[in-house]
Amino acid sequence: MSVFLRRSRRCPRTFQHCRLFSRTHGETPRHDTVELSYSSILPENGNATEKPLVILHGLFGSKRNWGSICKALHRDMPDRPLYALDMRNHGASPHASPMTYEAMAADVRKFIMDKGLKDVALLGHSMGGKAAMAYALSLKANGETSIPLSQLIVLDIAPSIGSLSSDFIQYIHVMQKIEDLPPGVIKTRTDADNILKPYESDISIRQFLLTNLKLPSHSKTTQRHDAEEKAKFIVPLGILSYSMEALGSFPYRYNPDDQSVPTTWDGPTLVVKGTKSAYINHKNTPAFRAFFPNMQLEELDAGHWVHAEKPTEFRKLVVDFLNES
């Protein structure tokens, strides 16, 4: 699950510089990369590098959100290594600016190169989907001759530019409000949920946001009040708050007048749309096909979180695509 733009119609440690991409084919800007935290499930034969599936979560998510799905995918594909990453400023990965898709794609590139991965299948949902597309498109734009990416899977997000939802701004605001409360006010997740409730009626969204909350250590073990300790979110709210424009953007622009794009990813691409979600629609589908000419679009009867709402159907789409393409 992730919180990104509109949900549906119902509606630090930095490392060496890494060459990345721009909107043209010229010299590309450089970004400090971070070493991403990850979890993995490896085949019994010890294969850790051949034909892995690398998963990128959405905004406010983490690798933990994909734990049960990864276990199920491992049962479906026991010979394929699985990696679920924490994107920068999420989970256990370092906090760093900028929070742009260029920077996120550079982090993913570093992970793939450092691990020596080959014939990578890259899967991304929402924010992670945009980062995955940005990485795929950067390969030709950068003129990389040795391309480790073989397949791309994008879940319910388009390669387009738009303003972030007011929901996103509101979530940041109330999360900052929770952090600003005096020590002792937030002792349990229920305490924090009561503050979130007036801003978000959907309990599943509130529970998802609160997976990022770190409670005072004494809250579960003792009633002793620690005047120094407060509830804190593990995501850097300051960085995210001033990254809203960047998170609504995309590094490459589609020209609707002549349907031209500055670069393409020509490999097999699976795009999964939730029919109850407006993220992928008739306005941005032409951009998808221009950037990813070897794209197949599949729909599931779900909202934005297609993998959580229809896990069995989602897994079948992914497994069939990886085995056949």
Regions found by a protein language model. Give the residues of each.
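Alpha/beta-hydrolase fold catalytic core
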Residues: 1-54, 71-81, 117-118, 320-325
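Active-site loop/oxyanion-hole signature of alpha/beta-hydrolase fold enzymes
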Residues: 39-47, 67, 74-123, 127, ...
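Conserved serine/cysteine hydrolase catalytic core
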Residues: 46, 217-301
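The conserved beta1-alpha1 loop
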Residues: 54-58, 125, 273
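Serine-hydrolase catalytic-loop signature spanning alpha/beta hydrolases and amidase-signature enzymes
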Residues: 58-68
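Alpha/beta-hydrolase active-site loop signature
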Residues: 60, 87-91, 159, 303-306
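Flexible "cap/lid" loop of the alpha/beta hydrolase fold
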Residues: 133-138, 144-192
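Catalytic histidine-centered segment of alpha/beta-hydrolase-like enzymes
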Residues: 299-316
